[in-house]
Amino acid sequence: MEDSRETSPSSNNSSEELSSALQLSKGMSIFLDILRRADKNDDGKLSFEEFKAYFADGVLSGEELHELFHTIDTHNTNNLDTEELCEYFSQHLGEYENVLAALEDLNLSILKAMGKTKKDYQEASNLEQFVTRFLLKETLNQLQSLQNSLECAMETTEEQTRQERQGPSKPEVLSIQWPGKRSSRRVQRHNSFSPNSPQFNVSSPALLEEDNQWMTQINRLQKLIDRLEKKDLKLEPLEEEVIEENTKPHIMLVQRQMSVTEEDLEEFQLALKHYVESASAQSGCLRISIQKLSNESRYMIYEFWENSSVWNRHLQTNYSKTFQRSNVDFLETPELTSTMLVPASWWILKNN
């Protein structure tokens, strides 16, 4: 489908020139779109980090992704261009060669029909306008039905692959070190979305006090990381915490940092709202807190999960994958994700 992300005339021209130069066969223009969407710094090629951010599917390990990257990189430049992507995937398309060709025709047909609708709808009769609306709705229904079938097939194949693997390696989850400046990590609480925020109404206002307690714990973690970065770190005696045998010792804290493009801010907020609502309803999700940094389109999402297994299962859900795919278009740079195990005793349930 046609991507809504705007491009400059120069980038459009370069894409047309590249397409002409490569003489792409029918259906292969999708790889021009893949390159444009995954190429976050707009240099016309994909680094390994950009490749990993776009192609990681939660099944291949980091090592396997690295091997695939260098297999595709036949020019040995440590970057991928459209020619290399087309050359590799064209050898493995099978029946999907016809699918991609049909999608290319469908994309052009839909754009042509919508252009005609935009031009003629206002002057059409009531009956003609009704027919246009009906056809748009039914076209959308057909496309959504196809999308549902594809999502089921995708989920089934991924699950089958995981089950068939002997001693499966750990799926790739982006884990990038914290930025160097401590100030960029500091929580600015006055800009956080509180549980009763009209923009992110994902929690009951009754949990506001609990939210404040959790922000205290988050600040405590960030101060600890700040101290660890200092060169004059002095080790101090620790207070030992005695854990009962049947007590779960740790929970998982996930920090996700997302820099959103200004033009996609509203769409991102809607996608984030749907994601938080779905994730919060999952068993094993203890808490999700969202903050927007001052004067920036940068979001910090803190997710608390019962353990790493629950978190990894969450990554394979449809709602999580949908959010990850949408972020390819909405984010200026690939998402930064860090995980940390924290004492489970910090989690205080109010309803105990």
Swiss-Prot record:
It comes from the Eukaryota. Ca(2+) binds at residues 39, 41, 43, 45, 50. Residues 190-202 have a biased composition (Polar residues). GO terms for cellular component: cytoplasm. Residues 135-163, 209-275 form a coiled coil. GO terms for biological process: blastocyst hatching; regulation of amyloid precursor protein biosynthetic process. It is found in: Cytoplasm. One of its GO terms (molecular function) is calcium ion binding. The modification Phosphoserine is found at residues 4, 192, 197. Residues 252-340 form the ABM domain. InterPro entries: ABM_dom, Dimeric_a/b-barrel, EF-hand-dom_pair, EF_Hand_1_Ca_BS, EF_hand_dom, NECAB1/2/3. Residues 26-61, 60-95 form the EF-hand domain. The keyword Repeat applies. Interacts with STX1. May interact with CPNE6. This is N-terminal EF-hand calcium-binding protein 1. It comes from Rattus norvegicus (Rat).
